[in-house]
Regions:
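Structured, hydrophobic secondary-structure cores that serve as assembly/anchoring elements
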Residues: 1-100, 105, 111-114, 273-586
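Small/polar, repeat-rich beta-turn/loop motifs that tile beta-strand-dominated architectures
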Residues: 1-33, 52-266, 270-276, 553-555, ...
C-alpha cells in the first residue's frame, strides 16, 4: 500500500541522572521534647526543621545540644527518639459537661507505666455488629497547644460528624470532618464516606484511633474502614453511629485529653532497644547515642549500650559508631573535674576491655567549650561537632577524606577543649600516647593564616591491627563502595548470569571507580570479574558449575590512599668552602 511522504520526529531523552546514596547522613539516638517514636524516616537537614518536628534536644547538664551543633555544622540527620520506662500516649475521656475546663480543673497527664487504654469515643452499630474506637495522642508527652491538657469536641451538621481540638486556653488547634453517613430509608440505601474516616485517622497531627470494642473480623481500625466499605456502604444494612454513648447532634460533645508521657530517663535497655530502628536505613555513615553518659550514671550501663552498638555495627558493616569519652571524671551530677590524659586513656582502656576493638568504632575525647544561647561559656559534649565535621567533609570532598586537621577539621566557633590542651607542639609525647589509645582529640593548634584555632586532631578507628583501616577515612571509603555499588549490583539480580551481563555490570561501575581514582580515594584499581570472557573455558575468577547455579563473583582490588601522618624535613646548613681566595689591592 502506498503512503504519502512525511517527516516523523521521535524524541528520546537519555539524560537520566543515576541515583546514588546520599552523602553526609548520620544518625543520633537522642531524647527530645516531642516527635515521632520509632520513625527516623524523615531526613532532618536544618535546625529549624528539627525544632518543628522534635522541639529541642533534652541535655541533662544544660550544655549545647549535639543535634544542634551537627545540623549547624552541615549534617543531615536521622533522629531516633529514645523513650524511657513508663512512656505512654495520652488519651481522651468523656467530659462531664459540654464546657471548657476552668484553670484549677486542668487534669495532669498520668505517668503510670504500661499500655494506654483508650476510652470509647465513637461506636458503630449495624444489625448485631457493634464496634467502637477511642483516641490516643500520636506523641508521648508531646505538646498539644499551650497547656498540660486539651479538649476534643464532636458535633453533627446535616449528615457529617465534625471534630475540633481545643487548646487549654480554648482556641481551636485542629478541626475537620470525621465521617459522613446516612442510614437507609425508603428511597436510598445506606451511604458511608469511609474515606473521610480514613483521612481523619491519617491527617490529624495530634490524634490517632485505637480500637476499643472489636469482633472476630474487625480487630483493627483498617478492618473497620474495610467493613464500612464492603458491608455497609450502598447496602440495605442500617448504620447507627454514637459519640460518647449517644447520637451526635449539633451540640458539641466534649472530651478531656491528656498528653501522655515520654517516661523517666531511659535505662540502658531502652537505648539498646532503640538501636534496632537504624537498621532500615543504610544511607547512614555515622551513628552515636547523644549525651548518653549524662543519662546513665554508671560506666557499666554506658558500656552495655556501647557493646550492643559495636556488635551491631561489626555484624552489619554499614555504619561507624562514635563513642564520646565523658568530659568529666565523674557523672556531671557528682562533679565537673575535666579529664586529663591519663583519665582519658584509663576510660578508653576500660571500654576496650568491655566491648573490644573494631574498625567500625571510634573514640572522641576532650570535650569542647562553646558559648551557649545566653552568651555563657559552656563545657559541652563533642559528638555533634564531630558529626558536622564528618558529614560536611563527606558531602564536599567525599567520605574517603579525613575530617581532622587544619583543612577539614577546624571548629571556628569552638573555644578550645574542656580537657587540657594537648595540641601544643611541646606536648607531642602526651598527644602521641592518646593516639596510641585511639583517642581522637579536640585541641587548639596554630594555623598558618588564622592564628590559634580549635580543631579535631587524629581521625583513627579502634582497629587493633595496624593496617590502613585504622584510619576512619579508609573505613568510610569501604562503606561508600558498599553503599554505592550495592544498588547497581542488586539491579542485575534475576538477569541472565552470562558474560554479557557481567560486561554491563563492569561498564556501569567503571565510571564510579575511575572517579574515585581522580578524587584521590584510591591510586589504582583492578576489577576482576570475567567481564571479557566469551565462553566458559575463558573463565578465570568464576567457574562453570557456580555460574550455572546463578552465582557470580567479582574481585575488586584497589590501592588505598591514606591520610598523611608524618612529614620529615631535613634542614642542612651547608659547609663552608675549604678554598680561600686572597686578593691584594695593588
Amino acid at each position: 500500500m502506498s503512503k504519502s511522504p512525511r517527516v516523523v520526529f521521535k524524541f528520546e531523552n537519555n539524560n537520566v541522572q543515576q541515583t546514588t546514596p546520599l552523602l553526609g547522613v548520620s544518625c543520633f539516638l537522642a531524647r527530645t521534647e516531642k516527635g515521632p517514636y520509632g520513625d527516623p524516616s524523615e531526613l532532618i537537614t536544618s535546625f529549624s526543621q528539627f525544632q518543628r518536628i522534635f522541639g529541642k534536644e533534652i541535655v541533662p547538664d544544660g550544655s549545647v545540644s549535639n543535634i544542634e551543633k551537627a545540623l549547624v555544622g552541615g549534617s543531615k540527620l536521622r533522629i531516633i527518639r529514645v523513650l524511657g520506662a513508663g512512656a505512654k500516649k495520652g488519651t481522651i475521656t468523656k467530659a462531664e459537661a459540654s464546657r471548657v475546663l476552668e484553670e484549677d480543673e486542668i487534669e495532669l497527664a498520668s505517668a503510670i507505666p504500661g499500655e494506654v487504654q483508650a476510652s470509647e469515643v465513637m461506636k458503630f452499630t449495624s444489625g448485631g455488629t457493634n464496634v467502637s474506637f477511642g483516641l490516643v495522642t500520636k506523641g508521648y508527652g508531646d505538646p498539644i497547644g499551650s497547656g498540660e491538657t486539651f479538649k476534643v469536641g464532636f458535633s453533627k451538621s446535616v449528615n457529617t460528624i465534625f471534630y475540633n481540638i481545643y487548646d487549654a486556653n480554648g482556641s481551636i488547634l485542629e478541626s475537620g470532618p470525621v465521617i459522613t453517613y446516612k442510614t437507609k430509608d425508603a428511597q436510598n440505601k445506606t451511604s458511608v464516606d469511609y474515606l473521610a474516616l480514613s483521612n481523619f485517622a491519617s491527617n490529624s497531627a495530634y490524634l490517632e484511633p485505637k480500637m476499643v470494642t472489636t469482633t472476630d473480623k474487625i480487630k483493627s481500625f483498617e478492618n473497620l474502614v474495610a467493613w464500612l466499605q464492603t458491608s455497609i456502604d450502598q447496602t440495605e444494612n442500617p448504620l447507627t453511629i454514637q459519640v460518647g454513648g449517644k447520637e451526635a447532634t449539633s451540640t458539641e460533645t466534649m472530651f478531656n485529653g491528656t498528653l501522655g508521657t515520654a517516661g523517666a530517663d531511659p535505662t540502658a535497655d531502652e537505648w539498646i532497644a532503640s538501636l534496632d530502628l537504624v537498621k532500615d536505613y543504610t544511607d547512614v555513615y555515622q551513628l552515636a547515642c547523644s549525651h548518653i553518659h549524662q543519662y546513665l550514671k554508671t560506666d557499666q550501663d554506658v558500656l552495655k549500650v556501647h557493646k550492643a552498638a559495636k556488635d551491631m555495627c561489626a555484624e552489619l558493616q554499614e555504619y561507624t559508631y562514635y563513642i564520646e569519652v565523658p568530659k568529666y571524671t565523674t557523672h556531671y551530677s557528682e562533679g565537673t573535674q575535666p579529664r586529663n590524659k591519663q583519665s582519658i586513656i584509663t576510660w578508653i582502656n576500660n571500654c576496650l576491655d568491655s566491648i573490644g576493638n573494631s574498625r567500625y568504632v571510634a573514640y572522641f575525647a576532650g570535650g569542647i567549650k562553646y558559648y551557649n544561647e545566653f552568651g555563657l561559656l559552656t563545657n559541652s559534649d563533642v559528638l555533634g561537632t564531630i558529626f558536622g565535621l564528618g558529614d560536611t567533609s563527606a558531602s564536599n570532598y567525599g567520605p574517603w577524606k579525613s575530617f581532622a586537621g587544619m583543612n577539614r577539621g577546624v571548629i571556628y566557633d569552638g573555644q578550645g577543649p574542656v580537657s587540657p590542651n594537648y595540641g601544643s607542639d611541646s606536648r607531642y609525647n602526651e598527644l602521641n600516647e592518646l593516639a596510641q589509645m585511639y583517642a581522637n582529640m579536640i585541641v587548639i593548634k596554630d594555623t598558618p593564616s588564622s592564628g590559634k584555632q580549635t580543631m579535631l586532631w587524629h581521625c583513627f578507628s579502634s582497629q587493633v591491627k595496624q593496617d590502613s583501616e585504622r584510619f576512619l577515612s579508609i573505613v568510610r571509603l569501604n562503606l561508600y563502595l558498599k553503599k554505592t555499588l550495592r544498588p547497581i549490583l542488586n539491579k542485575y539480580l534475576e538477569e541472565p548470569n552470562i558474560w554479557g551481563t557481567w560486561k554491563n555490570i563492569y561498564l556501569e561501575v567503571k565510571p564510579i571507580l575511575d572517579n574515585l581514582v581522580d578524587e584521590n580515594a584510591m591510586s589504582e584499581y583492578i576489577w576482576m570479574g570475567d567481564q571479557d570472557a566469551g565462553s566458559y573455558s575463558e573463565l578465570s575468577v568464576n567457574n562453570e558449575a557456580d555460574v550455572r547455579q546463578g552465582k557470580y563473583k567479582v574481585i575488586l582490588k584497589y590501592k588505598d590512599i591514606v591520610p598523611m601522618q608524618e612529614i620529615t624535613i631535613n634542614i642542612v646548613i651547608d659547609a663552608a668552602s675549604k678554598s680561600v681566595n686572597i686578593s691584594e689591592n695593588e
